[in-house]
UniProtKB/Swiss-Prot annotation:
Optimum pH is 6.0-7.5. GO terms for molecular function: sphingomyelin phosphodiesterase activity; toxin activity. It is an enzyme of class 3 (hydrolase). Its cofactor is Mg(2+). Monomer. Required, with sphingomyelinase, to effect target cell lysis (hemolysis). It has a high specificity for sphingomyelin, hydrolyzes lysophosphatidylcholine at a much lower rate, but has no activity towards phosphatidylcholine, phosphatidylethanolamine, or phosphatidylserine. Belongs to the neutral sphingomyelinase family. GO terms for biological process: killing of cells of another organism. Its EC number is 3.1.4.12. It catalyses: a sphingomyelin + H2O = phosphocholine + an N-acylsphing-4-enine + H(+). This is Sphingomyelinase C. It comes from Staphylococcus intermedius.
Length: 19
């Protein structure tokens, strides 16, 4: 979110893939 764009993006992508 703040200062962790890459980490957050990776998490979001993983969440989407899991769905």
């Amino acid at each position: 979110a703040s200062g962790e764009n890459q980490a957050e993006l990776k998490l979001a992508t993983h969440n989407v893939y899991m769905l």
